[in-house]
Each structure stands twice: as C-alpha cells, then as structure tokens.
Design a protein with these regions (language model features):
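Intrinsically disordered, low-complexity segments enriched in small/flexible residues
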Residues: 12-39, 43, 55-180
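Glycine-rich phosphate/ribose-binding loops and adjacent secondary-structure elements
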Residues: 1-17
Length: 180
C-alpha cells in the first residue's frame, strides 16, 4: 500500500466526495480499487480522472520538454504568493466496519475465484483497513494524523512479511511484480 501518505490522501478524497443521499460504499469502492489494482495513468487528464490530482489544484503540461520549466514557474508563483502548508484536517469521514465489510467481502470473493493470491488478499484488507479508518464500529470523523498513523502501521507490518520482500526484490531485479 502507499506508505507516504497516499492512502490517507485517498481516504480524504473519499470523505470529500461523500454526499447526502449517496451510497457511501460506492465512493469508497471506486477509490479503493484505484489503489488496490495499482492503476497507472498515461496522461495528466487520466491522472485527474483516477483521483491522483486534486480538483482545481493542478495544471497539465502537454509538452514533456516543458515539465521542469512549468514546475519551476509554478513553485516560484506559490512561493511569491506566500504559500504555506495547509493546516491538517480533523474532519475526515471514514466508514469504519460498514466499509470494511465491503472490502473484506470483495477480497474474499476475489481470492475464492482465484483472481488474487492470499498475500494480495492480505494487502487488500490492510489497504481497506486504513481507508475505512480502522476497526471503528460506525462511520466516524477522524484526523489526518490518525489516518497517517494507521497507514504507517499497515505499511510497516507488510514490510515485515517475507512475501512483500520477495515482491520488492522482484521489482528491483526483474522490473516485474511477483504474484506470490
């Protein structure tokens, strides 16, 4: 799972996308699958569609040779405008056990159908655990720090698994993911 705040960011975006009267689990499922299936964007527009870019907080450079220059210009504009890091949020809605049920049921059915390995199932469950805010009995409001702590715990526990280390080694040595 992403270990540098990426899972927290997707949980935050799920929270921002929830609307009254909407089925919360559908929003969670869409964002969960983006990470779980390791979807990669092939363009800036696709990255926005997948939720990797925050709405209204990005610009897309079409000419690859302009990437560095455009990034530098944007960074200087932000610095000149007095940009500071946003205050960490404490108003993130997570689904708790109701969301976890969806994640675990999906992981179990994918495993039973031989679409994913036992280790894939474990990773999916850890990812869902973080995105749902842990083992909370009901939908709750949590902070970014709470989600970051869950993410770090899940990431480090997976890093201690032999199968995870084998996957990392496969990526480094062969350039391909290992399905173990």
């Amino acid at each position: 799972i992403p270990g540098g705040g990426g899972t927290k960011e997707f949980a935050l975006r799920v929270s921002d996308e929830l609307k009254d009267g909407q089925i919360d689990q559908n929003v969670l499922k869409d964002r969960f699958l983006t990470i779980a299936m390791a979807k990669v964007s092939t363009s800036g527009a696709e990255a926005a569609d997948l939720g990797y870019l925050k709405a209204g907080k990005y610009s897309i450079t079409m000419n690859r040779s302009r990437l560095i220059a455009d990034a530098k210009t944007k960074a200087l504009e932000l610095a000149d405008a007095g940009y500071t890091q946003p205050v960490r949020r404490t108003d993130i809605k997570v689904l708790g056990k109701s969301g976890l049920g969806i994640v675990y049921a999906g992981a179990n059915s994918m495993f039973a159908g031989n679409y994913i390995s036992e280790h894939d199932k474990k990773i999916s469950e850890k990812l869902g655990y973080v995105m749902c805010g842990g083992d909370l009995s009901a939908p709750s409001i949590v902070s970014e720090q709470y989600l970051l702590d869950l993410e770090r715990e899940a990431f480090l526990s997976l890093c201690g698994e032999k199968k995870t280390l084998e996957r990392i080694q496969s990526i480094i040595t062969k350039g391909k993911p290992l399905r173990n």
